[in-house]
Amino acid sequence: MIIIRYLVRETLKSQLAILFILLLIFFCQKLVRILGAAVDGDIPANLVLSLLGLGVPEMAQLILPLSLFLGLLMTLGKLYTESEITVMHACGLSKAVLVKAAMILAVFTAIVAAVNVMWAGPWSSRHQDEVLAEAKANPGMAALAQGQFQQATNGSSVLFIESVDGSDFKDVFLAQIRPKGNARPSVVVADSGHLTQLRDGSQVVTLNQGTRFEGTALLRDFRITDFQDYQAIIGHQAVALDPNDTDQMDMRTLWNTDTDRARAELNWRITLVFTVFMMALMVVPLSVVNPRQGRVLSMLPAMLLYLLFFLIQTSLKSNGGKGKLDPTLWMWTVNLIYLALAIVLNLWDTVPVRRLRASFSRKGAV
């Protein structure tokens, strides 16, 4: 039908515009956090773009349902304000046409949301953790921040490099405060150095024109050694991820895992897809605009219902993962309540319900 194609086209344009704006906002927020971590030396600077790209599926989990909800709300609200829907009703078209258009968009959005929460999201979460773990276990040159004192993760050493150029660096200061085994504390200063990457993942650090101070000043075995070249081999460390991290599990693994966190995550992912249809159905009657109130006030109830839904579901997921409640029971109770509310709102202005309401009104008057 031409009317349905028109409604779908107008809503899709609004949805894509809103999706782009929301992604841009969330993208900028994540960019600020990642850049802050890179400046502090927590992550290598060359991983900024990779981490940003891997964070898109996580952002899309909440943005996809919201983009459709706002797209329908704004498009239908505009059509009500411009009396286009009033003219459609005058021509004999019912609200079922609006519901059909909303459901068509909901199907396509739900497919994208399902692919995202079932495959793309877990894959990106797992790969993101792998990248961060690899960067921490085997930092290499990318993790060297020039002009800053950097402490090792275990606090055993402190490194300072004045300048870094590719695999070469100048003015090095390395203090091994708590060395392993029977080794004594030492301080190494060097004019320059470079890092070589081996095929097996190991790294060879070579320092040139420097001095090594070993021992403590209070002991007689304090040693000072000048050197032309000083080499150290840093072995490649294998990275192990947490196998119980539910964010990285696919749907089959979640289904077969009998833990509170797995059940909460499973119901949360299904809810994200179910929400697309439920909110699309609910937004049709909520988009009706009262000319005396204006579009902004007419949108408030819909926005409050949407916000309340996700606040409740987020709380249920968190408490369900901690074993404080049954996530399946409570999350789907909220889903069914909202679905029932959406059905009631769509049927509220139909002829059978009007007659039913009128009969109750007459009985109340008697």
Curated annotation (Swiss-Prot):
The chain crosses the membrane at residues 16-36, 54-74, 101-121, 270-290, 296-316, 328-348. Residues 1-15, 75-100, 291-295, 349-366 are cytoplasmic. The keyword 4Fe-4S does not apply. One of its GO terms (cellular component) is ATP-binding cassette (ABC) transporter complex. It comes from the Bacteria. Its main location: membrane. It is a multi-pass membrane protein. The keyword Iron-sulfur does not apply. It is found in: Cell inner membrane. NCBIfam families: LptF_YjgP. Component of the lipopolysaccharide transport and assembly complex. The LptBFG transporter is composed of two ATP-binding proteins (LptB) and two transmembrane proteins (LptF and LptG). This is Lipopolysaccharide export system permease protein LptF. It comes from Shigella flexneri. The gene is lptF.
